[in-house]
């Protein structure tokens, strides 16, 4: 895992996975392959660009960083003193073939994304084709050396098969566990007309600009509607818009405030241009809040397929406004979608399901 302390602080899905594996006595230990902060900054500066989206993309697909992390991970594994009979890595940034293949150790990976899915989220022509191909080649080499691949979503599982040409027998849907237990919706008022948006970065790519434009149209018909935007001080000063800064879910006070915002929300909206997984939709569903996402990436699978809301065309503020108006006009339908989302969390999106699927596959190889 990269950056164990950071993953723990933010309560990431990957940290929760390892915690659940530990509680079920299936975890021998964790090798943290995080690199020093000064080196991470130097690598990021190396990829500098005037356009921040391009800068981030170059950094995400940096083969120098991948190779550096891979070497650190191999050294960490060679020094690991615990007993283990299988290896589970997070993501595709680590090429550990030189360690596990000579030792005949079954190796697996767990993913919320891959390079093909990531590149589809970028503006066309943002990076040279050669840069993208190098990243694809690196990932393909990693996957070819693994015994199996686990994904958070069925959408991503299809990408591994269709884009990388991997065998369906090698790719396994594992799922995702909600960080929040579903609570009773008795007494929840869906007629508050409070719309919640959560994003700690990439405001435009997460659909924030489109949502603001849609909300202006909604406000004309529902004057008491409120748009609550959480994740960063976005410097937005508009009638009916309430902005909260970053809330650290690792801090008890911030976590309580975060959950209270979901509790009071009538509708969660994040029309992101793409989502690797969209954990925040699961958080909303855990609180019985119906969702609107965009018709891209994993959002149709999580939201629409679970009858927890719907998806609209990415970037289409008119369609988004019409959908919000339709939903706010029908609190009964909002409640039904909220209840459906909660059922999905209870029956599907829990870590017991995830670790059960992972352990079931790994046991066939040991």
Give residue spans per PLM region.
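Membrane-proximal helix-turn-helix segments that form the acceptor-binding/catalytic region
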Residues: 128-149
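Aromatic "clamp/platform" in nucleotide-sugar-dependent glycosyltransferases that forms part
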Residues: 273
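Carbohydrate-associated surface elements
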Residues: 155, 177
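Conserved acidic donor-binding segment of nucleotide-sugar-dependent glycosyltransferases
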Residues: 305-306, 310-317, 326-332
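Conserved donor-binding/catalytic core segment of Leloir-type glycosyltransferases
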Residues: 182-217, 227
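Short hydrophobic beta-strand element within catalytic cores of glycosyltransferases
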Residues: 290-293, 303
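Nucleotide-activated donor-binding/catalytic signature segment of Leloir-type glycosyltransferases, i.e.
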Residues: 231-267
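A short, well-ordered alpha-helix in the C-terminal region of glycosyltransferases
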Residues: 319, 326, 333-348, 354-360
């Amino acid at each position: 895992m990269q950056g164990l302390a950071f993953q723990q602080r933010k309560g990431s899905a990957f940290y929760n996975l390892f915690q659940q594996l530990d509680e079920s006595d299936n975890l021998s230990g964790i090798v943290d392959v995080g690199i020093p902060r000064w080196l991470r900054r130097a690598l990021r500066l190396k990829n500098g660009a005037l356009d921040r989206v391009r800068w981030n993309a170059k950094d995400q697909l940096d083969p120098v960083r991948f190779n550096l992390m891979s070497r650190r991970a191999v050294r960490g594994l060679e020094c690991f003193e615990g007993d283990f009979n299988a290896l589970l890595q997070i993501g595709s940034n680590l090429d550990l073939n030189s360690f596990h293949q000579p030792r005949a150790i079954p190796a697996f990976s767990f993913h919320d994304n891959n390079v093909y899915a990531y590149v589809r989220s970028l503006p066309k022509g943002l990076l040279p084709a050669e840069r993208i191909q190098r990243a694809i080649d690196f990932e393909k080499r990693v996957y070819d050396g693994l015994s199996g691949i686990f994904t958070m979503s069925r959408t991503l599982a299809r990408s591994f098969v269709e884009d990388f040409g991997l065998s369906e027998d090698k790719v396994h849907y594992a799922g995702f566990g909600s960080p929040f237990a579903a609570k009773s919706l008795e007494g929840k008022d869906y007629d508050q007309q409070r719309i919640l948006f959560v994003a700690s970065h990439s405001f435009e790519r997460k659909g924030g600009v489109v949502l603001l434009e849609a909300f202006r149209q909604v406000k004309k018909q529902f004057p008491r509607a409120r748009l609550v935007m959480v994740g960063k001080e976005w410097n937005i000063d508009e009638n009916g818009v309430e902005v909260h800064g970053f809330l650290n879910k690792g801090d008890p006070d911030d976590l309580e405030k975060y959950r209270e915002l979901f509790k009071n929300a009538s509708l969660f909206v994040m029309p992101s241009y793409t989502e690797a997984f969209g954990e925040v939709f699961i958080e909303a569903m855990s609180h019985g809040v119906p969702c609107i996402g965009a018709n891209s990436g994993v959002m149709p699978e999580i939201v629409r397929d679970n009858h927890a809301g719907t998806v609209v065309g990415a970037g289409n503020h008119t369609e988004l406004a019409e959908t919000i108006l339709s939903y706010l006009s029908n609190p009964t339908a909002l409640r039904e979608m909220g209840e459906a989302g909660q059922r999905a969390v209870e029956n599907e999106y829990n870590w017991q399901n995830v670790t059960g699927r992972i352990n079931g596959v790994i046991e066939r190889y040991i």
